[in-house]
């Protein structure tokens, strides 16, 4: 079954009863860069499946996207609160940028996320590199993302959708301050078997972060099953495999598999564009 962008807005409002919709990811959907003309900026869409898949959704629903401001001119394109409206040709939602330092990028992103989490989840623990400073910075940056989310939903009902392995702890920090919010998380890479994930010294803490969500999503049923087994054995959660739930400290997280889609019309247009054979 497919659904058009024009149908998404009414469907969301029907099921979420007017809650503000907030997407949270490491990668931003639009970057500002300085052009060759002095003082002028260009806007580009970074390559990547996550932003390509979610940008049409956000344009249909509106709301807020919280992400790392990675473009060289990003700071010059936002208001004092770090916000800008996107896309530039038809502003439909607000992008709230989170700023990362040089150490943040090298320890949270290139370090813990990409040198540890990525190979571990792809069944290559032999390629992992772990440093105490990587983990500490990962925690710190996840808390910074959580603080940005909390600022944007202060005094509001909201549905928050976290993305991927960069932000495994952020739901825990948000839940601690706002237990009333609806939290979901989609994991865009494989989730490994327990025998692999337990090799992480921080496995229990990472799982607690993910279990703070109301809904945890994966691409495949096997990834969801791996997560449930890890939740039971490594985090001490009470797991119901038939219902696909994991309960920890009185909070129940539902776990499912939701293969992500693509913008079919966009791919058809690209395939028939001049110069494509």
Regions found by a protein language model. Give the residues of each.
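Catalytic cores of carbohydrate-active enzymes across secretory and cytosolic contexts
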Residues: 1-277
């Amino acid at each position: 079954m497919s659904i058009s962008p024009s149908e998404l807005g009414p469907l969301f409002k029907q099921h979420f009863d007017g809650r503000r919709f907030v997407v949270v990811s490491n990668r931003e959907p639009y970057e500002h860069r300085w052009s060759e003309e002095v003082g002028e900026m260009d806007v580009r869409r970074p390559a990547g499946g996550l932003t390509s898949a979610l940008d049409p959704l956000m344009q249909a629903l509106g709301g807020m996207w919280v992400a790392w401001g990675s473009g060289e001119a990003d700071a010059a394109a936002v208001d004092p609160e770090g916000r800008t409206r996107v896309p530039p040709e038809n502003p439909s939602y607000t992008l709230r940028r989170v700023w990362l330092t040089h150490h943040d990028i090298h320890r949270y992103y290139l370090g813990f996320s990409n040198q540890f989490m990525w190979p571990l989840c792809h069944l290559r623990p032999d390629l992992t590199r772990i440093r105490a400073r990587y983990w500490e910075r990962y925690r710190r940056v996840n808390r910074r993302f959580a603080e940005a989310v909390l600022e944007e939903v202060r005094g509001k009902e909201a549905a928050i959708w976290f993305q991927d392995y960069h932000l495994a702890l952020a739901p825990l920090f948000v839940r601690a301050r706002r237990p009333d919010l609806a939290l979901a998380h989609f994991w865009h890479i494989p989730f490994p078997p327990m025998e692999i994930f337990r090799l992480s010294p921080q496995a229990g803490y990472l799982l607690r972060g993910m279990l703070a969500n109301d809904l945890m999503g994966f691409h495949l049923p096997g990834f969801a099953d791996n997560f449930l087994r890890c939740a039971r054995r490594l985090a001490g959660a009470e797991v119901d495999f038939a219902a696909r739930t994991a309960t920890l400290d009185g909070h129940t997280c539902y776990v499912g598999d939701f293969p992500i889609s693509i913008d079919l019309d966009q791919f058809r247009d690209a395939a028939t564009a001049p110069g494509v054979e």
